[in-house]
Each structure stands twice: as structure tokens, then as C-alpha cells.
């Protein structure tokens, strides 16, 4: 869920395992909509996105970069830059539901899942939420049988997402913990992902949020994974 045509945010990731051991990650996230608009209605009808993540702390991930080209009709493209090896690694579509830098979030959680990959069913409406059941069109490509999403009626922000395994047991839950209004946009500033099977939990906190800062398309390229766009990072 994103507002504005582009944006920048600083994020602090806190990863806690089942024994209470804590690790931290700090990163800058840049995002740009690649929307085309209808000349008559001036409404976006194609909403592809590009995402750039630059890690700043701790030392073992410093200067690491993650790039996503989010597609609507084909698989997203993802790359990871490993500075210690000066290596740009393409992340296969089959790996999109694996751990993102050792956290409880998956790569796909960070970049977002394509709506066309699932069947969607409105199963309940409450005073505040639309409750939607989402079932994968290709069950063999994912580890879940379905996921249930609670979408806030006023902001359309998913406040909770529950994932169910092939046996129908809930095993992951994502929560929106805090929403602030920034530049007139309702913005998630704290979120979590909990793995009920492993006992791990990751919290993401977002600050220094800025919208419509004029990001250029060329930033979202392999070149800038090696040579980060400093003017937008600090």
C-alpha cells in the first residue's frame, strides 16, 4: 500500500527469535510508481512500481542493496547487491517467499504480492473492515493455502493479514501497529510479521517519510545498486 507518485522512508527492523535474541537492520527505502494515466479521466490504469532498498546498519549488511521491478502481468524482477563480493544476484521467482535478510518478512512481503496471482472473495463486512479471503491461482507455487486480509474501510490499509498452511492452520500473521497522516496521506509507520511456527517476530518502524520527492527512473537500475543515489539517501 503506497501513496503519492514516489516516496522515501527510513526503516528500523527489529528481529526477535524464539529465544528472545534480537538483531537490528536499518535501511532506506525508495519507491516510484510507473503509472500511465488515462488522458480523458486522468486516472492511473497501469500501476507498476519500482522499489530500491539500501541498508545502512549493521556492518554485515552495510551498503547492501535490494531492487524490485514490480510487474502486473508477469513475475516481478528482483536483484540483491552483495558489496563484500561486489556481486549482483538475481532473485528467482521461486525464492520470493523466502526470508528477507534473515527476518520474518519474505521478499514478497517487502515488494508486495500481485493481486492477479490470487482469487479474492469478500467474506465479511464489519463496521470498520472489509474481510477478504485470498486463494492462490497456482497453489503449488506457494506454501500457504489462503490468507485472510482485514482492510480498513476508510483508509484501505490492510491492518491484519493471516496466512493459513495447507492443513488450514494459521502460521503467519502480519499486523499494522501504527498509522500516521503524513503530507495528507494515511501512512503505516509501524508493522510486524510473526511466524507462529518458529516463534520469531519482526517489527518494522518507519520514519523520515517523504512523498513526491522527484525520484528519477534511472535510480532503479543495477548501476545504482553499486553506486547508491546519495542525494536521496541522506
Cite the ranges covered by each PLM segment.
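Gly/Pro-enriched, hydrophobic low-complexity segments
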Residues: 67, 71, 77-81, 87-115, ...
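N-terminal mature ectodomain segment of secretory-pathway/periplasmic proteins
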Residues: 1-84
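Gram-negative outer-membrane assembly/targeting C-terminal domains
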Residues: 214-234
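Residue-identity detector for glutamine
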Residues: 5, 26, 49, 160, ...
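Sequence-level motif detector for i,i+2 pairs with an aromatic at +2
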Residues: 4-6, 48, 115-117, 127-129
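Conserved catalytic alpha/beta cores of large enzymes that bind or transform nucleotide phosphates
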Residues: 119-121
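A generic membrane alpha-helix/interface feature
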Residues: 30-32, 178, 226-228
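Residue-level signature of transmembrane alpha-helix interfaces in integral membrane proteins
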Residues: 28, 124-125
Amino acid at each position: 500500500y503506497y501513496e503519492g507518485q514516489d516516496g522515501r522512508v527510513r526503516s528500523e527492523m527489529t528481529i526477535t527469535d524464539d529465544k528472545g535474541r534480537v538483531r537490528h537492520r536499518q535501511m532506506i527505502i525508495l519507491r516510484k510508481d510507473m503509472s500511465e494515466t488515462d488522458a480523458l479521466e486522468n486516472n492511473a490504469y497501469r500501476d507498476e512500481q519500482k522499489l530500491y532498498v539500501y541498508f545502512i546498519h549493521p556492518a554485515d549488511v552495510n551498503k547492501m542493496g535490494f531492487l524490485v521491478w514490480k510487474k502486473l502481468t508477469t513475475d516481478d524482477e528482483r536483484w540483491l547487491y552483495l558489496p563484500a563480493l561486489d556481486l549482483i544476484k538475481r532473485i528467482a521467482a521461486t525464492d520470493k517467499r523466502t526470508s528477507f535478510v534473515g527476518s520474518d518478512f519474505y521478499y514478497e512481503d517487502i515488494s508486495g504480492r500481485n493481486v492477479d496471482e490470487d482469487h479474492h472473495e469478500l467474506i465479511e463486512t464489519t463496521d470498520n473492515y472489509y474481510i477478504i479471503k485470498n486463494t492462490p491461482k497456482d497453489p503449488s507455487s506457494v506454501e500457504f493455502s489462503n490468507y485472510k486480509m482485514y482492510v480498513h474501510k476508510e483508509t484501505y490499509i490492510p491492518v491484519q493479514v493471516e496466512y493459513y498452511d495447507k492443513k488450514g492452520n494459521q502460521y503467519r500473521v502480519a499486523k499494522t501497529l501504527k498509522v500516521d497522516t503524513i503530507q495528507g496521506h494515511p501512512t503505516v509507520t509501524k508493522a510486524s510479521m510473526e511466524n507462529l511456527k518458529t516463534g520469531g517476530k519482526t517489527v518494522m518502524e518507519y520514519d523520515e517519510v517523504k512523498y513526491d520527492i522527484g525520484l528519477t527512473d534511472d535510480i532503479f537500475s543495477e548501476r545504482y545498486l553499486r553506486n547508491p543515489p546519495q542525494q536521496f539517501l541522506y
